[in-house]
Design a protein with these regions (language model features):
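Sec/Tat signal peptide C-region and signal peptidase I cleavage site
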Residues: 2-6
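Charge-biased low-complexity segments
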Residues: 7-167
Length: 167
C-alpha cells in the first residue's frame, strides 16, 4: 500500500528558522529550486576561498593539492552520523535520493566550523524537519576533525562535501 499523505515542504523559499538555541537560514536559488540550508552563525558559507599567504583566490593547481593527512575513519563516521539522524520513516521517504552535505573546516584547528546541506525544493529532503539537519551539524562538529597538511593551512578554510542517501 502506498502512503499518499501530504508531507510538509519546509524549504520552498528563502526563510530564516528561529529555533530554540540556534537559527538556520534557507536560501533558495530562484528559478532553479536549489536549497542551501545552514546555521545562520556560520563563518565560511559564501566566503571566498583564498590563499592566506597571497591573499589571492585559490588557483586551479592549488585546488588539487592534498589539504588533509591521509586517514580512514572520517568518511565512515560522517556517513554514520547522517544515517543515525534520520528516523526509519524519514529514510523511507528519501529512499533512492541523495542530498549533499558540505563541511567547512578550520585550517588552524582541523575542526569542522560549518555544515551546509544542499537539495532541491521538490526533493523529499525538503520534507525533513530542521531538527534533523541540526542534529547532523552538531554531531559532525563534535565528532569529526582532520589533520591539516601545510598546503591546507594556506587556505582560509577547507571545503569537503559528499552526497548521501541515508540508510
Amino acid at each position: 500500500m502506498v502512503d499518499l499523505s501530504a508531507q510538509t515542504n519546509y524549504y520552498r523559499q528563502d526563510k530564516t528558522f528561529y529555533e530554540e538555541g540556534y537559527t538556520y537560514q534557507c536560501d533558495v536559488t530562484e528559478g532553479a529550486g536549489l536549497v542551501n540550508l545552514y546555521n545562520k552563525d556560520s563563518k565560511y558559507i559564501y566566503a571566498k576561498l583564498i590563499n592566506r599567504h597571497t591573499g589571492e583566490k585559490i588557483s586551479r593547481e592549488e585546488e588539487f593539492l592534498n589539504e588533509f593527512e591521509e586517514e580512514t575513519w572520517t568518511k565512515p563516521k560522517c556517513r554514520s552520523i547522517v544515517n543515525n539522524a534520520f528516523s526509519s520513516d524519514e529514510k523511507q521517504r528519501v529512499k533512492g535520493e541523495e542530498f549533499i552535505i558540505t563541511m567547512y573546516i578550520d585550517p588552524d584547528t582541523g575542526k569542522v566550523a560549518d555544515v551546509e546541506f544542499i537539495f532541491m525544493t521538490f526533493n523529499p529532503y525538503a520534507t525533513i524537519p530542521i531538527s534533523v539537519y541540526r542534529k547532523i551539524e552538531v554531531e559532525i562538529k563534535k565528532n569529526i576533525w582532520f589533520k591539516i597538511t601545510p598546503e591546507g593551512k594556506k587556505r582560509n578554510y577547507i571545503m569537503l562535501w559528499w552526497g548521501q542517501e541515508p540508510k
